[in-house]
Amino acid sequence: MTDKLRKYVLPNIPYVFIGWVFLKLGTAYRLAAGGDFAHKFIGLGQTVSAAFADFAPGLAPFDWLVGIVGAVAFRLLIYFKSKNAKKYRRDAEYGSARWGNEKDIKPFVDPKFENNMLLTATERLTMNTRPKNPANARNLNFCGIGSSGSGKTRFWLTPQLLQAHSSYVVVDPKGGVLGQVGAFLQKRGYKIKVFNSIDFSKSMHYNPLAYIKTEADILKFVNALISNTKGEGKEGDPFWTKAETLLYCALLGYIIFEGAEEDRNMNTLVDMISGMEVKEDDEDFLNAVDYMFKGLEQRKPNCFAVKQYKKYKLSSGKTAKSILISCGARLAPFDIPQLREIMSYDELELDRMGDRRTATFFCISDTDSTYNFLVALAFSQMFNLLCERADNVHGGRLPHHVRVLWDEAANTGQVPNLEKLVAVIRSREISLCLLYQQLAQCKAIYDKNAETILGNMDSVLFLGGREASTIKEISENWLGKATISMQTEGRSRGQSESYSQNTQRLGRELMTPSELATMPGDRCILQLRGLPPFYSKKYDLKQHPNYRFTAEADKVKNAFDLDRLIDRRRRPGMNEECEVYEVSVPDEALTDEDEDILNYDDLDDPDAFV
């Protein structure tokens, strides 16, 4: 009813007054002396004041007829003039771009500081993706662009972790962020997980095969493995990649569904390929793996592994040897002893990050990218695992929002189908934050899909840089043009001096590429979907309420002890001799870290000990 009142009644109230005016003019005409129109019209001047002296409209039918006809005629006049009116946009002839202000961002900010995603020093975005007003709903996907030294880690990534409102997955070049905030998160009750490709002796274990449950999982894993180990340069004949895929699927199918639990890891896959001897001159030669699959075929002739292996065996001896060489080259990193040990079992629990507050750090080298593909491999599994767990266990939404803070996203490989995942993870309480040095890096990895990925980022932040294509994209497509006034002056001298001054309108970018390239180091530009861009100061880490808990504020008190975390969780090696002592420990003596090691939180999961 309120909407109808606002739409139909309120706009027509002024015409009631117009009708009253015409009614009074009708009264004046009726009271005027004379018998015809001309004499009555001349006599209006003497009766107008008397007609308007009384506010009451009276009951004379003639007066009401004049009032109604006059009001309707006036309304029709306004209607037709508005339909035929020329369209003018004053001060917006060439564009209406402007900088955003406090009023623009206010509806998107949560009153509680800790319930926001920090964007700049003055702009924040609520973590609530389902606000009361649907028009204010924004996804939490984010893209940050800034050249080296522009403050992507210090001014944006680290403050996000100090908010401590979600589960976090952090790609941490050099491991500096973990040392900065690890102790703070631990004190806040977070379960800390670390995969350290810089120093495997200070890393938890990651076994990608621990998350493979179905044949579809095998295909997803193989695609991710091949995508991130294809090396640089132009891709060769796709035949060899497809042949490798057949062999990987067959071997993984055997390992997952037929192998012992302790053998379900990448080491077994590498060992099986190493043991697949092929003789070019003897097509009937059978190696150890051939005999394994021959026995499996007798037991389960229609199983997935057998079908894939039979297709692989269609190749000749020479072709099979080339396939094995290609597989061996691709899996060469998994022959390194440190990596074999780190992938022997799993501690990361990638599928449980949304079940409780967890902070998982992937520490990578910023100078050597040998092992960086493992991060993309883990991420490709993690997104699918979290979506499946949200749908199958938690009714579509994870209990704890999971934020993926992916620093140096260009140096850690490719996640297959990321353009599709980024569009659907929002509803499962997962958000992706990508940090690049320039837009071209994203396009180099994901090609045409880069636009789809960036299009699903409601928040984009430019922290500074001078790469030409990036600043041109920002100037022309992010910021747009504003209409400005230009004043020109002219003066001519001769026999008679003349002076002229003209004002005209023209369009100008809010910031030109050259202005973006010379933007002050403490400034940034934020683009939030549906709002004008914001030209603001970067968030000062020292101004955060929890800054005092960082290692930078107090290195002695707040430094994170990674060695202690890893040593307490260490599992003896397969051939390591250990002495076991039976002791009784009172419950009050157990620490939070002991409880993490024992995984008491998994006792209610029927699949935890299968």
Report each predicted region and the residues it spans.
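P-loop NTPase motor domains
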Residues: 5, 24-27, 138-430, 445, ...
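Basic- and hydrophobic-enriched, low-structure N-terminal and domain-boundary segments
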Residues: 1-150, 154-157, 201, 491, ...
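Low-complexity, polar-biased intrinsically disordered regions enriched in Pro/Ser/Thr/Gly
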Residues: 126-131, 230-239, 261, 485-504
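Extended alpha-helical interface modules used as scaffolds for assembling large macromolecular complexes
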Residues: 509, 548-549
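Conserved ATP-driven motor cores of ASCE-family P-loop NTPases powering translocation/secretion/packaging/pilus
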Residues: 422-525
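Short alpha-helical interface patches
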Residues: 47-48, 52-53, 62-116, 215-225, ...
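Generic preference for hydrophobic/aromatic residues in regular secondary structure cores
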Residues: 116-136, 146, 206, 383, ...
